[in-house]
Regions:
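A beta-strand edge to alpha-helix "cap/lid" segment located at domain peripheries
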Residues: 55-61, 69-140
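A short alpha-helix capping/helix-coil boundary motif
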Residues: 1, 29, 77-78
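Basic/polar N-terminal segments that are highly enriched at the extreme N-terminus
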Residues: 1-3, 139-140
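Soluble or luminal CAZymes and related metallo-dependent hydrolases
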Residues: 3-7, 45, 94
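Short acidic-aromatic low-complexity motifs
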Residues: 2-26
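A solvent-exposed, acidic/Ser-Thr-rich amphipathic alpha-helical stretch
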Residues: 20-24, 28-73
Length: 140
């Protein structure tokens, strides 16, 4: 089972803005993809989502470090996403820990990502980021 997860992670990590046509090798036509900020249904919407994602960043990389099968055709991938956006954190590299829950037969038909949306985006916005940092200091 973890062979599927390792192979999926390897292929996913090789994706970039010029290879999104390969999403069809990883996902079914009716894939359901969800993360804390988006929900898309179908390979066409998924391709559009990733096209927009890659268009808005200058660098994007996934480093997978955990491959955890939980049953037949299901499991978790643990990863660190690293990206640069010209308008966030002065274009500095931002790293976000996360995990993906996958359901598959021959290909993935359900993909659910879990990550801290604040660490991904909100904490790096000029005004909102300062407010979040202040709140974290007060609560910590």
């Amino acid at each position: 089972m973890s062979d599927f997860l390792r192979q999926f992670a390897r292929q996913f990590a090789q994706l970039d803005k010029n290879s999104l046509q390969r999403l069809g090798e990883l996902y079914t036509e009716d894939v359901h993809f969800t993360d804390p900020l988006h929900e898309v249904q179908g390979i066409g919407q998924l391709r559009s989502y990733f096209t927009e994602l890659y268009a808005n960043v200058t660098e994007l990389r996934f480093d997978f470090h955990g491959f955890d099968p939980t049953g037949e055709g299901q499991g978790y991938l643990r990863w660190v996403m690293s990206y640069r956006h010209p308008r966030l954190s002065g274009g500095q590299l931002i790293r976000v820990d996360g995990c993906s829950y996958l359901l598959w037969r021959d290909k993935v038909y359900r993909h659910r990502d879990y990550f801290d949306a604040g660490a991904l985006l909100y904490e790096h916005l000029p005004v909102l980021g300062r407010a979040i940092a202040w709140l974290k200091r007060r609560m910590g």
